[in-house]
């Protein structure tokens, strides 16, 4: 659960002496309940952390690469336990654990080939597993009806793949502690842009809807100039 190598590198007596249990009194009931429900390390169904030990564990992970580990860990601990500074949720979840993934968000571009698309979805699943939020640019993926050279067939466009990505984020939640978070991005010139804008609707074919995924349409200055000038806008794949 906790990185034993990291623990062995610290003088735990020094860190224990720095813990101030009186700081537990700064919590509201709701804050303490949230900490207990979502953030404490647990073994099976048993929580094995207390609030100040939790903050020290996070601080130890953050100070791991510092020259004077104990001094920096205590400095980080005091910042966290006083609420003067608070790390992001993945850092609080994972610092000093066997999977020290500390970043909140990961951005990627999905390539225009089948293997690359599913490699991207697999990467999303693994990142979500360890509490990472996800943002994928789908602009490179060809649109519906586009020729596929390898099979001499026609592409189904981005929407079916977005449905798979949406369901992956639902299936692989963030460390079992909160729902997966994913956002799909598409540029305004893409031929599938109109269907993309319908993804969150509650009507229509549910197989072409992504109710759990956020969507974002990248709009360049040129598009807005065309709108102001009442000119045409070209879509392509």
Descriptions of predicted regions:
Residues 1-237:
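Extended catalytic cores of very large enzyme megasubunits
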